[in-house]
């Protein structure tokens, strides 16, 4: 829950909101915040549970992160489930000594408050519905006009994310976005996973070892979505972003006319990533 949206909800409905963090595998809660909490925090660990922020190499913990440094969130406690039915899923879910890998990124402060900064796993989460990017990439990569595709979450102020994909086309191809979406719709059984948008790109951003670097794609589409939103509402401002070590993706909006700042804040308050307006 973004802090601006939290404040807006409290003001509109005259009711206090406490932020929290959890997932199905933890029987709802991992942490919850008292009504007085630092902005952006999802609270402290619930009683009898443990939270650990680490760097991972596969399933091996290489380092416990110091305060303020972002890493993978591990959780252990009586609220954590016993495991998945599928052994294949279990093999990737557990780290040493019963620690469950949430797949989320976050950090803690000196007072024990937890902050979410991103996601380590590539899942697209559409209003609580988990979508495996592979469901989208498999039919796209099988198309003769596609060299490679990468599915990521399209920022959405209502559902959090919608499925989308970046695609590198074959040389000379004139395939359109609508045609590829129609191809996915006919090839995919999971309706909620059909991409809502496809962006064409000359080449995928790669890591030093040649793997597709999804954070750059997320950064790119986030800027695009916000720029389109501002254009639609006739707000003239500059949009930029950066990937911070602690907070993850941070979007910056600057140069907005003073009489439109209030409208701008209302427009972007539903997004879950950090937005700074100057």
Positions of the model-derived regions?
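Solvent-exposed beta-strand sheet faces enriched in polar/charged residues
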Residues: 20, 54, 117, 152, ...
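Generic structural signal for coil/turn-prone sequence and helix-edge features
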Residues: 269, 273-278
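Conserved AMP-binding/adenylate-forming
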Residues: 3-20, 24-114, 121-123, 136-137, ...
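Active-site/pore-lining binding-face segments in mid-to-C-terminal subdomains
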Residues: 198, 204, 213-218
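AMP-binding/adenylate-forming catalytic core of the ANL superfamily
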Residues: 77, 82-83, 92, 97, ...
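Short, internal active-site loops enriched in acidic
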Residues: 156, 202-206
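Glycine-centered tight turns that cap/initiate beta-strands
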Residues: 14, 48, 89, 145-148, ...
């Amino acid at each position: 829950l973004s802090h601006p949206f939290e404040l807006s909800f409290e003001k509109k409905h005259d009711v206090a909101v406490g932020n929290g963090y959890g997932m199905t595998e933890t029987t709802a809660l991992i942490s919850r915040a008292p009504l007085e909490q630092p902005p952006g925090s999802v609270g402290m660990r619930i009683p009898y549970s443990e939270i650990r922020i680490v760097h991972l190499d596969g399933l091996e913990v290489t380092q416990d992160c110091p305060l303020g440094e972002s890493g993978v969130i591990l959780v252990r406690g009586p609220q954590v489930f016993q495991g998945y039915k599928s052994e294949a899923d279990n093999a990737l879910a557990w780290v040493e000594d019963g620690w469950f890998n949430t797949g989320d990124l976050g950090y803690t402060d000196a007072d024990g408050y937890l902050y979410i900064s991103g996601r380590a796993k590539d899942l697209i989460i559409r209003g609580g519905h988990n979508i495996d990017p592979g469901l989208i990439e498999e039919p796209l990569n099988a198309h003769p006009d596609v060299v490679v595709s990468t599915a990521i979450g399209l920022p959405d102020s209502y559902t959090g994310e919608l499925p989308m994909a970046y695609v590198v086309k074959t040389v000379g191809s004139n395939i359109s976005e609508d045609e590829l979406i129609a191809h996915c719709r006919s090839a995919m059984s999971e309706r909620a996973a059909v991409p809502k948008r496809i962006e064409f790109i000359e080449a995928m951003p790669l890591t030093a070892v040649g793997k597709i670097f999804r954070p750059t794609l997320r950064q790119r589409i986030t800027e695009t979505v916000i720029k389109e939103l501002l254009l639609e509402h006739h707000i003239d401002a500059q949009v930029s972003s950066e990937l911070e070590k602690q907070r993850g993706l941070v979007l910056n909006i600057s140069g907005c006319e003073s009489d439109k700042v209030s409208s701008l804040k209302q427009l972007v308050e539903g997004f879950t990533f950090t937005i700074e307006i100057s």
